[in-house]
């Protein structure tokens, strides 16, 4: 498996309290995951409608996290990917997510790594034009700028 235990530990330090708070019935348990990805205060800064949706769907997110963790693809599996791949990360993303992007880029043959400066984990909502342009470039087969 492609591993980076230092950065992987960052995810574990978030998911433990997240799962515990959710199990205790804490309505704001999702703060752990949202602020992990977006930085402290991200959940509080979201519009009430978005925040309400996040709270209402926390159980689904916890199930997603608990069923997909740990996901450890082998180096051989990643190196066998034989399709054009663009790995996108935000310049302000959590260090663990930036590292995952680097590992994917290094392991998938011919993959492009694109960093969107000023963005974090929530790129589709914070940088929709940049994401749309990258998708268009990828579909058209032109290199990302």
Each model region followed by its residue ranges:
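Conserved strand-to-helix beginnings and helix N-cap segments that scaffold or border functional pockets
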Residues: 8, 97-101, 125-129
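Conserved serine/cysteine hydrolase catalytic core
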Residues: 50-106, 112-115
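Catalytic active-site module of serine/aspartate enzymes centered on a nucleophile-bearing elbow/loop
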Residues: 109-145
């Amino acid at each position: 498996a492609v591993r980076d235990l230092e950065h992987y530990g960052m995810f574990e330090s978030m998911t433990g309290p997240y799962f515990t708070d959710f199990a205790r019935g804490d309505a704001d348990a999702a703060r752990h995951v949202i602020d992990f990805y977006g930085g402290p205060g991200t959940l509080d800064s979201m519009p009430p409608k978005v925040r309400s949706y996040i709270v209402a769907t926390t159980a689904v997110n916890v199930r997603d996290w608990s069923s997909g963790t740990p996901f450890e693809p082998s180096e051989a599996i990643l190196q066998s990917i034989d399709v054009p791949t663009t790995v996108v990360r935000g310049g302000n993303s959590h260090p663990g997510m930036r590292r995952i992007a680097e590992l994917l880029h290094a392991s998938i043959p011919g993959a492009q790594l694109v960093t969107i400066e000023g963005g974090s984990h929530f790129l589709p909502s914070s940088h929709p034009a940049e994401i749309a342009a990258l998708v268009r470039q990828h579909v058209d087969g032109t290199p990302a700028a």
